[in-house]
Amino acid sequence: MAKTVVRKNESFDDALRRFKRTVSRSGTLQEYRKREFYEKPSVKKKLKSEAARKRKAKKKRF
């Protein structure tokens, strides 16, 4: 869980910016979006192999 303590004399915008940066670095939103809906194991397997195929093709190009 991302936690941000507002510093003395820090504006709300700066604190919000630091919080957003902390959340994005920790991967909280990505994890939430990944688990938002249930995926059947077969679909997960298909997506995983598709991603591997894309990575392999991209690596082959360069």
From Swiss-Prot:
This is Small ribosomal subunit protein bS21. Residues 53-62 have a biased composition (Basic residues). Gene3D superfamilies: Ribosomal protein S8. GO terms for biological process: translation. It comes from the Bacteria. GO terms for molecular function: structural constituent of ribosome. Residues 43-62 are annotated as: Disordered. PROSITE patterns: RIBOSOMAL_S21. Transmembrane segments: none annotated. It comes from Levilactobacillus brevis (strain ATCC 367 / BCRC 12310 / CIP 105137 / JCM 1170 / LMG 11437 / NCIMB 947 / NCTC 947) (Lactobacillus brevis). GO terms for cellular component: ribonucleoprotein complex; ribosome. Keywords: Ribonucleoprotein, Ribosomal protein.
